[in-house]
Structure formats: C-alpha cells, structure tokens
Amino acid sequence: MLCPVIQKVIFSKQAFVERRLPVAGHGKFFVKKGTKVRPFDFVAEVPEAPRNPGSQRLTAGVGGEVVEVLSGRAILIKTSAVSVRGVIGKGEDEEGEIRIAADYNAPIELSAVDAGCASNVLVGGFVPTLEVFKKAEAVGVRGIVCGGTDFAAFQKSNLPTLLIEGFGRPPLNRKVFEFLKKVEGRHAFLSPGHEELLVARLDGAVEDVQEVGEVFAKLEEGMEVQVFSASCFGQMGKAGKVQGDMVEVSLNGDKISVPGRNLGIIK
C-alpha cells in the first residue's frame, strides 16, 4: 500500500520572505533590488504611527538577496530557510523569535506566559485553555506553535496559531520540537494560512533536516503515521498490520482500524 509522505521539517534552498512596513505608505526602504542583506541589517526606517509607537528601523530578518521592492509597502527577499509544516492554522501572518515555553508533551501553562514572551513565537506541547491564548495575546506574543488545542479555545482565540498535529491535546511531533529547540532564539515567520512556520537559516548553519524528497512511499508495519480520519484527526501513531485497504494503527495504547487513504507516513 502506498501512502503520502508527510515531511514535517523541510530545508528549502530557495524561499521568499516578504518584509512589510507596519503601515503601508509610512516608512522608507534603504535597500534596492539586488541588494545582499544579512538577518540583522536594517532595511527600512519606520516613523511613529498608532500601531508603531516611536521611530524604529526594520531588520531584514533573513540573509539573502532583495528581488523585489514595492515602494512604501514591502520588499521580497530570496533566501534559504527551513519550513515546519502543520495541519491547521488560524490568524494573520506574524514573525518573532522562537521561544520554547513547554516540553513537546507538556502544556503551555499560564505561568510560562509573561512580559518576557513579548514579540516571541511560543512553542510547546499543547495549549490547555483559552486563558493561555488570551494572556499570550495580552503580553504581546506574536503567535503559538504547538501539537494541538481544544477546538473551542482555538475558535475563540485571535492569536495566530499553528497546530502541528490537530485538535485535542496531542504532543508536539518530537522531530519538530527537537529542531525548534535547537534554533530557539532564531527569527521565524509564522504563516497560519499556509500552515507553515518558516525559520531563517544563518550563514554557515547546518540543520539536521532533509530536502523535499519522495511524495509517496510503501507503508510498512512499525512506521510512524499521522491519522486524518475525523475522530482522530492529526494524531500520531504506529502502523500495524495491513489488511486490504485498512491499516491497524496504535494510538496511545489503543488500536484502531483506519483506511489507508486517511494515513500519512511521517519522515
């Protein structure tokens, strides 16, 4: 049986990052098309505005080459980056430094969210309550990346959020967590609408990730899989016996039968 391959963490030799002014028409870019930039190079001056108290300078956030300049609005930078893929996202695009707020299988607690998290993208196992989302938004957190959260809390929250596994309280994929832990403090771009977190690569940095490879692979017993059936959407488990079109999957100690078309192989 062939199943789609799900690569959660992928290195891309060519990625594009848009750096926008907080308010269109309010600011001036220093760079032009063809300019080479580094992550902490200033690329624009941003004057004081209602959403931007005090004059500031906008950094590139990534290293690469400016390939497009939209005067008074944005620039497009060609770079190399690592993409972390989720299954469900909500909210506007945001950016910030990665901050580990909880272990891969632990909840992001209210006590872990404080003023020091401002301008960060928080990472943890799962978000247990709506109050955590509300406090994170109140202190200036830019977004959350986690394994899952309750559907009701997800729907009521306004904070940009990327669920790597799905609804409920599944732990964050271990490979994803280990990668994000390794690059904690790195600037990242959260795009919930595209179900993706883009992590800038630093010059000379070597990440233990793979480039996009096979799209389908033969499902074998013992493989790590992700379930996309309604009752267990997004949960991870181990493939067991394959009988016709059905696959036995072990989930948290329980065994369920899932149609092969509703499984993805994790690599």
Which residues does each PLM region occupy?
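Well-ordered secondary-structure scaffolds
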Residues: 1-267
